[in-house]
Amino acid sequence: MSQSSTTTEIPQEARDRARSLGWEEGLIEIAIEQGHSLQEIWQALRGGVDGVRARQFLSGGGFVRPDPWWMKVPTEWGIRARAADPALGLSIQDLMVGTYGDVPDVWTNRTEIARGSFPATVGEDMGYTIFDKAIVWADCCVPLYEIAIRDRWISATDLDWASLEPLPAEQEKAVCQLMTELSERAYLEGAILSGWLPAISYGYLELKLFLSTVIYDLARHAETFRKRALANGGGLGLQAPTDYSRTVAESRSFVELMATLFVQDSMLLTLYESGDLIAQNPLEREMYRLCARDRQRYMDYQVERMKHFLFKTPERREEQQLYLNRAEAKLVRDWNDPAVSEPLALLLAGDSRRMDEGHRRLRELRKHQVSAYLANLQRTTITRKTLNGRLQDILNA
């Protein structure tokens, strides 16, 4: 036996692996005597080279290539995805071809397997809990993802912060109080959604991608509102009411969460769309416009998801009414908080000496918000049976 074989310490793990592959005793030592390093031997063992091929290799000096079994999996091959619109480039919609575009009603694999790939013999449970397409899916999430990526904006540079001019103290305080509330609501919703994202199984990849853009949008909104509060001689105001936020955070299922958020999301979209009424300068008008554009995408998903869910599970229609009842009650309670209503009324009035006019305009804005909310519900095929009494009073006023 050569000096190299006697001085090279062969790990027991390597011997055990060799034995499991059918290597005869002493074959590792022979390989070392022929000048092969322990690293090369490990590569052969990890590559699955069995004893017969190892002996052939060492006897003849030829290279034995491990069997490329991974090349033989029966996935759909020969795919050449092409951009439907070359101007927009290759989109995720363009990738939904053949079996790769088949989004099943129930995803049964609990691992990180990519849809369309071939499952390994053994895989670890990755903790997913949402496997039903009806719970999360909306076809619009595919194009909405592309739009979200295309329409992304940067608050630091896309808003002209240098254009801000001092406002009267009471107006600046009203703006900052509103910014405090809106920043908190955006932050909380993004945080809650990000906590649910890992529960959605990999089979609904496109939906997960879209929700990732929503979470990013909400983070940008929280950032932008905070910047506005701190950029013009003001500061943050009183913490926003937490009744509604706690209801959101306590949702026990994705279905409950989406129904609960539907109420606030619709109301906030209408508020942002009405930004010209409360903006005190061009920067704020542009801020509300950009936030409304982001919120519209999310609302489109909310509507289509609910519509798809009710179509697939009509027996759960009445359940949604319960969630909406609870959410509306919490929203009304928040709306009645002076820290929420007074700043809006002052901004709508333009002057604290015209607060009666400001409250009148606020009632008009609230009526518009409730009407738009009910219209969004109608798009999902839901008709509210017992709209919250105070919301009904707003409509009737």
Question: Model-derived features: where do they sit?
Answer:
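Extended amphipathic alpha-helical segments with heptad-repeat/coiled-coil character used for oligomerization
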Residues: 245-252, 264, 303-325
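Terminal targeting/low-complexity segments that flank the catalytic cores of oxidoreductases
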Residues: 2-206, 255, 312-397
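Solenoid-like repeat scaffolds
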Residues: 201, 277-278
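Long, hydrophobic, well-ordered secondary-structure blocks that form the structural core
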Residues: 189-249
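Beta-strand segments within the central parallel beta-sheet cores of soluble alpha/beta enzyme folds
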Residues: 242, 285-293, 315-322
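Alpha-helical transition-metal enzyme core signature, strongest for iron centers
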Residues: 182-190, 211-229, 258-269, 288-306
